[in-house]
Amino acid sequence: MLPVLRSGLRRAVWRCGHGLLQRRIAAGAGWYARACASDDAASRSPLKQEMLNSTEYLHVQNILLQKNQQRMTKQKLLSEATGFYDRFKINTKWLLIRGNRPFSGEEISTLLSWLILSQVLWVILGTTTFVSLLLFLANTVLAKEMVGKFVGNSLNRYMDGVDVQFQDAMVPEWRKGQISFQKVRLRTTPGAQDAGLLTFDLMFSKLSLTLSVRKWLQGRGLINDVYVSGMKGDVSVGAAERKDAKLIDFFSNPNYELGEVEVCDSVIMCTDQEIGQKFRVSIYNMRMSQLRFRWSLLDLFNADVVSGALNHSLFSIHKRQHKLPLHEMEKDMAPWKRISRLRLNPISVKDLGLDKSNAFNWIEGGSVEMIADLMLPNIYPESAAAEDENKYVVMDLRITFKDLIASMNTVPPALSNGRELISFDELKPIIMFVNNRRGLFSSLRNLDNNKLWRPTVTIERQQSYPDTTVIPMRTFQWPEGEGSVQLNQEIIKYHENPSDNSNEIILRCRIAKHMNELQNTFLFKETDVYDKMALELYTDLMKMIEETEYKKKNDWVKLLGTTFASQLLIFGLGAMV
């Protein structure tokens, strides 16, 4: 047993170092001493006593003592270093292995594993910084134009139907943590123009974005935040060959999601090929916290602010202002998450394409103004929610038509599916009501603007006064105390006399839609919201016409009754006299 222990101790001494191996030697020596002590306790033989007093045991103890005395601290190693490289080497080794010995194979493999893992984490968590560093190195080594062409060609290989061209350098912005592109052109290829529902040719003055590999691994796209400035171009939406075809089918990944989206100073010419109408859409400022392709309409209504112009008519989407938060009511809009207001200033009916639509093809001229309050629920369908949670979007619309011009069309109004909305017999009273109202208000305006009703009288005098004296025509005023009686107010009303000169027809309606019905839609015409709005507007318009006819009939009955009663009174008084 003793030769085995001796050989083991020798090998341990040769493998010993400054730290860990010294502890191994001390443990071996302690084990040797405990073994000897146990053997001595078992039996006090002369052989065991001789082993304790042997020179080999004393030699091992001497070596351990020398190693403990020669142990050097970090400060002593640094004091003996001669240069920066030596100090860096000592600090690095002391941080990693707490010593100054060479690295072992296991330690080197561990360092390489941690290095690779850290690079993977850097790419996942800091994708924009990683790509910015690559672009910076590429711009430093190669020409900037070559880098832009290479990136554009690489993107075109993986994007079907879309052509991307970088006409200027790609510069990383370190302060903002973005990658900026100058003069970027994005357009559809000729093959996609022939077969797709959507074709576009857009030019971006400045395009900044951030990337996220983590989002890309989740299947939600590589681009995270997008900032667009100076976008202009043409966008055309074609007619769908299939009834179930939607605009989202153009995109290869319908689950694509963007983070923060900002667009400013942009102009787009949109063409609706189905009705042959062009719209000039100007976007002054748009800020959205998120944009998901599957919920694009809801995210648009949830935008922080959207302001722009449609054919030079201003529109805006913003959070509606109300007085309830002034009273510090936490759940003042429950069960709604937010109430957004969509406002469109007066716009010509022809600019809006209303005369070319199937539902309002009898309108030839005039203007329309719209105010819509959209009540959005607190939760989205993909989140876990109880069954009693509100999942409906309520749209409260107020549409004002002004100076409408109506005429009978050869085709009756119809819905988007071709179903007849109203018949010609039901349409005739509407056209008569609109045209009679327009004729009445136009005559009143001509009467007010007629110079004969406000003449300027001039009198020539022979005295030393000025040659011409101007006497303005003054408006007649009732005596004091009778100011409540208006000039145009009649005691007995013989005809319809409106209270103002604005030929406005105000229609109101409310539409409720389940959130799932707005999923995977980019346009309102892809949903049946437009058809429901047309039905509600026609119902309100017919109700207005019936109320007007009833009021007119009631006024004539009052007039005839008053006239007949006055004649009887005069006849009775005459008979008495």
Curated annotation (Swiss-Prot):
It is a multi-pass membrane protein. The keyword Membrane applies. Residues 12-115 are mitochondrial matrix. It holds the Pfam family MDM31_MDM32. One of its GO terms (biological process) is mitochondrion organization. Keywords: Membrane, Mitochondrion, Mitochondrion inner membrane, Transit peptide, Transmembrane, Transmembrane helix. Its main location: mitochondrion. Residues 1-11 form a transit peptide. The chain crosses the membrane at residues 116-136, 557-577. One of its GO terms (cellular component) is mitochondrial inner membrane. Signal peptide: none annotated. Belongs to the MDM31/MDM32 family. This is Mitochondrial distribution and morphology protein 32. It comes from Eremothecium gossypii (strain ATCC 10895 / CBS 109.51 / FGSC 9923 / NRRL Y-1056).
